[in-house]
Amino acid sequence: MEKTVIALGFFDGVHRGHGALLRKTAERARELGAVPAAFTFDRPPKEVVTGQPVYLINSNRDRQGLMERLYGIERVIFAPFDREMMTMPWEAYLEMLIGTYGAVHFVAGHDHRFGHKNAGNVQLLRQKCAEMGIGCDIIPPVQREGITVSSTYIRTLVEAGDMERAADFLGHRHCLSQTVQHGQRIGRTIGIPTVNLAVPEHVLAPAHGVYVTEVFLPDGRRCAGVTNVGTRPTVSDSDRVSVETYLLGFEGDLYGQELRVEFCRRLRGEQRFDTLEALRREIQRNIQQAEAYFEA
């Protein structure tokens, strides 16, 4: 069995606090000749325990992508948070990680809890690791502007559409990776074709409105974008939230391909226009704003 150094946590947003933990994981893995790994769950434990939906900053796809791309984590383990996992005693939980995944070292945040009824804490983690000859690092909280970096705080920024402040606390831009879907092609009728993405279930949609974005294509290219998040009130009566992006200077068909949209700045709230021509003029103005953003 290959040796692993395992980062413990849920990692929603993969923010600066998580980054400190994941960097230490990669560092320890290099020292020990092990694989840097992260152990997390396929859904929030709170959602299972309370039965209430929990809205996350990122999909599992984006959580994994951020950990791999930014911090060099080579193995992300999404364990099902089921009844067996929920009722597993904390000691059995650690023994499972060692026996099943070859853990030789753990890295956890200062407030990490684990095991049945969250009975395990970092003091018990240190104690158990010492007994078993396993290494352990506990990472202190990271602060920004006197505020502790947390997923909870960053969710409020994303919901408010404050993408620049969110990026400061995340350590990277907020992103959405999804497969391009067929839309109604209304953008084409006004000379502004868009690619359409869906917001995954139980993932936060940013505040409705228009954003400057940068879009990463499957072939490695990147394009400036103008992205509308919302219900498209000018052309639709549906309350379904969609993410539609116009790619500046791009021509081609991206249906069925996966894109990553990174949110840079919110330009305005979502508006209802009386005519498609008025909508077209406003989008053209937003395109000019996006061009100016990337030229600055």
What are these regions (language model features)?
Residues 15, 67, 106, 166, ...:
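Residue-level signal for inorganic ion chemistry
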Residues 183-296:
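Phosphate/ribose-recognition catalytic cores of enzymes acting on nucleotide-derived substrates
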Residues 129-231:
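Glycine-rich, Lys/Arg-enriched anion-binding loops that position phosphate/diphosphate groups
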Residues 47-132:
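N-terminal Rossmann-like or analogous alpha/beta NTP/dinucleotide-binding catalytic cores
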Residues 38, 78, 138-139:
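A structural preference for short, hydrophobic beta-strand core positions in alpha/beta folds
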Residues 1-59:
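N-terminal catalytic cores of NTP/NDP-binding nucleotidyl/phosphoryl-transfer enzymes
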